[in-house]
């Protein structure tokens, strides 16, 4: 068997007829039209001490990361207005900016008051104004909030910059001494905190739909078991204790169920458990490997990876019974499915025919066309922003596991700052407010 479901094989190691398709599917290898130029001018500051965060830089980076906007560098700006009355539109027209944002930060009673305004340069009209207040420690939160408000006003799509991310680090000190940590950070990798630390592997962390719980696989008992942990209190609950593989947990949209993979009856199959009643139901029943479940928004449809056709491809089925339907047809390897928020796009790990590289790709579910988003070689574990505009994934750079962000339109691709050691298994949170 080829290197089937690389992530699953890692778990298995720790634990101990092709379907035809019409050749109408299309492979696209790059993005197209350019992002809209936007200027986020450095915010004015009326206090004495230097602020710990650059608000304008955070807002600018957020808008850039979406793939919709191309920020104009500060050094190229002709003027630096900090309030609406100071904006000279000819300066921004000369730079080709479509939008310009200005802001001002004022200390007030131990807090910071931030006023901001966004303008359409061509029409010279204000399109958004607002204010937000908080403490020094909340500067990043306020910047992400401003970016969220601006993005939604300009695109009609709810911003996802105030969300969080989970990921796992593995720091090796010697042959038999590796420290694994489960981290939570801002979506952009900032402000990471440790939720769990172990000398045994941690895999497949997943946010619950309420953003208050997480599920993950831990080897702390020397074999894989699935746990649910409450983020605020740290309280944990063991969900599975079966022989063999216990892996790949996935939450139902209402948070009442978990789908996961068990090999207790032989080969890996997908099961669903009701977390209240603890009733366990088997979903797949096939001699192949079935893994990496992901719920559709209806709470009944499961997308998953299987080699039942000879090579890893993506299928979907109903948790209440019925056969599996193949979804992916382009390429000789498609795995680790995730859906966009509107369920029109499937994000996956893809390998083209005749190639050995694994890349993040998106498939238009209506047309079947596939677009490759990345240019790296060993991508894995894609996770999608709740608004569907960005993907975070794990890959390797210079021999080290790292996390990368790519916009769904392919315009932006950049590394995320994370801790030392191997970094893997990212998971994007739902909206948190």
UniProtKB/Swiss-Prot annotation:
<keyword id="KW-0574">Periplasm</keyword>
<feature type="signal peptide">
    <location>
        <begin position="1"/>
        <end position="21"/>
    </location>
</feature>
<dbReference type="InterPro" id="IPR014167">
    <property type="entry name" value="Tol-Pal_TolB"/>
</dbReference>
<comment type="subunit">
    <text>The Tol-Pal system is composed of five core proteins: the inner membrane proteins TolA, TolQ and TolR, the periplasmic protein TolB and the outer membrane protein Pal. They form a network linking the inner and outer membranes and the peptidoglycan layer.</text>
</comment>
<protein>
    <recommendedName>
        <fullName>Tol-Pal system protein TolB</fullName>
    </recommendedName>
</protein>
<dbReference type="InterPro" id="IPR011659">
    <property type="entry name" value="PD40"/>
</dbReference>
<dbReference type="Pfam" id="PF07676">
    <property type="entry name" value="PD40"/>
</dbReference>
<dbReference type="GO" id="GO:0042597">
    <property type="term" value="C:periplasmic space"/>
</dbReference>
<dbReference type="Pfam" id="PF04052">
    <property type="entry name" value="TolB_N"/>
</dbReference>
<dbReference type="InterPro" id="IPR007195">
    <property type="entry name" value="TolB_N"/>
</dbReference>
<keyword id="KW-0132">Cell division</keyword>
<comment type="similarity">
    <text>Belongs to the TolB family.</text>
</comment>
<keyword id="KW-0131">Cell cycle</keyword>
<dbReference type="InterPro" id="IPR011042">
    <property type="entry name" value="6-blade_b-propeller_TolB-like"/>
</dbReference>
<dbReference type="GO" id="GO:0051301">
    <property type="term" value="P:cell division"/>
</dbReference>
<dbReference type="GO" id="GO:0017038">
    <property type="term" value="P:protein import"/>
</dbReference>
<comment type="function">
    <text>Part of the Tol-Pal system, which plays a role in outer membrane invagination during cell division and is important for maintaining outer membrane integrity.</text>
</comment>
<keyword id="KW-0732">Signal</keyword>
